Structure formats: structure tokens, C-alpha cells
Amino acid sequence: MEFSVKSGSPEKQRSACIVVGVFEPRRLSPIAEQLDKISDGYISALLRRGELEGKPGQTLLLHHVPNVLSERILLIGCGKERELDERQYKQVIQKTINTLNDTGSMEAVCFLTELHVKGRNNYWKVRQAVETAKETLYSFDQLKTNKSEPRRPLRKMVFNVPTRRELTSGERAIQHGLAIAAGIKAAKDLGNMPPNICNAAYLASQARQLADSYSKNVITRVIGEQQMRELGMNAYLAVGHGSQNESLMSVIEYKGNPSEDARPIVLVGKGLTFDSGGISIKPSEGMDEMKYDMCGAAAVYGVMRMVAELQLPINVIGVLAGCENMPGGRAYRPGDVLTTMSGQTVEVLNTDAEGRLVLCDVLTYVERFEPEAVIDVATLTGACVIALGHHITGLMSNHNPLAHELIGASEQAGDRAWRLPLGDEFQEQLESNFADMANIGGRPGGAITAGCFLSRFTRKYNWAHLDIAGTAWRSGKAKGATGRPVALLSQFLLNRAGFNGEE
């Protein structure tokens, strides 16, 4: 679908459809009032007759409104004006896209971007409208043989801004929104792929294709098991021992700042393409969803695509830590003691706490890049789901400014994260009689003790950990990958690049 931005009066629009908002109770938005005045009270008369209350999700399609050039006007219920927040705004946009497609509109001029959303400017409203529209239209049917093409006649959406001064920021919002939406789609597509197709080799092939598509700024290197052995990445290797699929670490380097002093931001994504739990095997119910245990790597891939598409003037390295955790005669066992790349030893108490074993070696590996900051993204703990549910990502960090940056970016992007503590009292839960540490610390504070484990491998740089176990995918009827936290990390990097969305 094509997006553009313009500044114009609603009565002069010759588009097939104009979209305006109505608040509860039967209150016209300012743009709707203009149309009502031009039409000699035609719209307000319909509302007085009870045709539309203005509740969220309500719609009314008007044809051939007097004195209006557009063929149709779509009225969208926006709820109470004072309660229009970010979440409600996105829901209104989603309803708009679905209704326009259902009614056969091929193009529309949307004035919803002129609604007042507390604390949000036109850039934010246009960008979120683009991202939400793309999210609404997403489907994953690559593997279906009988594809039923959904009815989607909508081809062009124009967002209106109040004055010509906002056109530049509106165009930039569309550019950013499309790049972020493409990154989210890429992450969702990877996440939704079945594990018999999407293994570590598949992740590596996608990383190589990204470098081919953006060869000017991107190079990809793939590190296999032989090189991992030479590097001493024994914890990473142990996790993949039970699988017939080779563990592969894909390193995607984007260089947008040629200065020798420009240190990179490193993103590390957990890429367990299937996690059976290993010898500490998981219950069979819901095990199919363990294909989503690579959503951290998928998110990092999506963010790297966004960075390359927008050619941000910063240096970013994305690492996809591809691996598969399976039981078998060669699988690692509870009771094993592993020597990590850092030299620290780990007693394995549970082979289903494998993500941290993969990540700890990758976090040691990335020291060589002398990073400005390192952010790992992982579907790490069920404990984080218990703590924060399926709406908020868990955040831990050894650096307060970095944590504050990420929280701020999460609020800007509408991809929320919440900071959890890292304290010495939690570190004590990882003590082992036989090694430097155990790979689990018991049930209490499980998300935090996982973060504490990782923190022992990040002492040489500023680091943050995003636990996306609750936010990376949905179960039930709407089952599928969400693409989070691509939006959060994209906003963080846009801010670092100087594009913070302020007009």
C-alpha cells in the first residue's frame, strides 16, 4: 500500500473517501465540523438521529454528502476526546484500515492524524498510523497451498497534516514508519517459520541475503562449530550437541559512520530455532510454540534491516545466535560443568535454561568490537511472563543511562519495557558447589537471576538485557510472532542517530 502526506482542506478533497473522527457523545472532531458546516448540518443531523454515538470501533459510511467533492466520508468512533491515548489511537487506525478494505475503497485521505493525542506530535501520529496499517494488513500464508486472497482493495492512503510546515516531518514519519514496519514484518516472518525450515543455517542464509541486498554498508560473517571450538565457546556448543543441525552464529555488521572513533552498538539475539528443553525436556503441551525461541534473533535481524534501509549514520552490529536444543545421545546433561569462552565455569542444573548458556559466550565474543553498548534480546524466562504478562518486555541493565534511554524509546515507540533490578542478593542464588556458578537460581525472581547470570559476562561494557518471553508471540486464535521489540530498538537507534521525532 502506498502512503503519502499532504496539507489541505477536507471540502477540497476529490479522493474516493475522507476519514474523520467522531467523539462520544456524538461530538464531531474539528475536521468533521468543517465538513458538517459545508454540508449545511448534514452530518450532525445524522448523529442526532442516533446513527453514530462515537464509541470506539463504531463506523458510519456516508455517500454523496452535499457540497463535498469526495464520493464518501467515513466517520470513525474515537471514544471520549480526553481519553484518546496512544493505544486508542492505534485501535482507531486499525479499525479504519479494516473498514476501508471491507467497503471497497481504493484510496482515502485520512484526517485522523489531526486528532489530539496527549503528548504526541504529528510525526508520531503519522508514523504510528503507517506502522499500525502495515501491522493490520500482515498475514503469514507462505506455506498454505490454497491461499484465499483477502479482499484488500485499498491501495493508497494520504495522511493530512494541519499546515504545510508539517509536510517534511510527515514525509520523514512515513519513511521511518515503512522501514520499521518492514523490519517488524521480517522478524514476524522468521518467527512464524516452522523449525524444520528455520534452523540456524536458515538464519545464516537470511543474514547473508541482507548483506547482498545492502552491500554498500552491510557485511555478514557466519561462524560455525569448528570456529566456535577454536574460540572456546563451549557453553554455546554444548546446547547444540543433541541436534543434527549445526549451531551457527551470524554476525551482521552495518557501517554508517566511517570515523575510526565511532564505536558500534551491538545487538545480540537468542536464536534457539527449537527448544525442546533438551534432557530436561519440556511438557508436550504447547511445545510447538518453542519454534518462537528464536524471536530474539528474528528481532535483531529486523532491526538490522531497518538500519540498513534508512542508512542511519551510526555503526551497528547484529549477532544471530542460531542453535537448536534437542535431547539425544550427544546432548549435554544436568550435572555437566562447562567452561565458557570467558573462562568462567558453569554447572548445568537444568538443560532447559539453555538460552543464557548460548548468550554468555556471545556476550564474551562481542568484547572484540569495543562496543558503545551491547543489548541482548531473548525469549529467556517464563518467570518474566509471570512478572509482566504478555504486554511489557523485561529490561535489566548494568548502566543506568542506557536503561533510561531504552525505557524512553519504548514509551516513544509504544513498545513498552519495564526495568527489573539486578542485585547482589539475587546473584547469591546462582552459587554452585562445583563451579563458578549454576545456570539457574531457583524459582524466586527467575527473570532477575537469569539477568544476573548474563551480567557476569558483561563487565567490560555497558549492557542491557531485554527478556521478551512474554511479548515475542501470541497464542490462541491470533497465534503468531509479534515482531517485538523491533519498534523499541528501532526508536533507540533512531534517537542515537539524531532522529528523535521532535519537530
From Swiss-Prot:
UniProt cross-references to PROSITE patterns, sorted A to Z: CYTOSOL_AP
The keyword RNA-binding belongs to this UniProt entry's keyword annotation: no
Cofactor binding notes: Binds 2 manganese ions per subunit.
InterPro entries the record matches: Leucine_aapep/pepB, Macro_dom-like, Peptidase_M17_C, Peptidase_M17_leu_NH2_pept, Peptidase_M17_N
Enzyme class: hydrolase
Subcellular locations according to the entry: Cytoplasm
Keywords: Aminopeptidase, Cytoplasm, Hydrolase, Manganese, Metal-binding, Protease
Catalyzed reactions: Release of an N-terminal amino acid, Xaa-|-Yaa-, in which Xaa is preferably Leu, but may be other amino acids including Pro although not Arg or Lys, and Yaa may be Pro. Amino acid amides and methyl esters are also readily hydrolyzed, but rates on arylamides are exceedingly low; Release of an N-terminal amino acid, preferentially leucine, but not glutamic or aspartic acids
One MF term in the entry's GO annotations: aminopeptidase activity
Known cofactor(s): Mn(2+)
Family per record: Belongs to the peptidase M17 family.
Functional note: Presumably involved in the processing and regular turnover of intracellular proteins. Catalyzes the removal of unsubstituted N-terminal amino acids from various peptides.
Protein name: Probable cytosol aminopeptidase
